[in-house]
Regions:
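Residues in the helix-turn-helix
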Residues: 20, 31, 60
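Residues within the helices of the helix-turn-helix
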Residues: 8, 19, 48
Length: 74
């Protein structure tokens, strides 16, 4: 699972919309939408604010440890 997929998986688990993630992080909704469409990936400087908004650690976001139940990285 790539990082953007993991972000949306966690958002779904937390019933969080793209607009809510945008409000919590200050990241434009258009950028978040591009991640969903797999046009781009989140920039490294956004990862900590995404982790804070989703209440996860950077390790969880990058590796999926402790959060992925349906998907397994191979």
């Amino acid at each position: 699972m790539i990082i953007s997929e993991r972000i949306f998986y966690i958002m779904e688990q937390k019933n969080m919309s793209q607009l809510e993630l945008s409000r919590r992080t200050g990241i434009a909704t258009s950028n978040i939408s591009d991640w969903k469409k797999k046009k781009t990936n989140p920039k490294a400087d956004c990862l900590l604010s995404i982790c804070d908004a989703l209440d996860i650690t950077p390790e969880q976001l990058l590796t999926g440890k402790g959060i992925d139940t349906e998907y397994k990285d191979t």
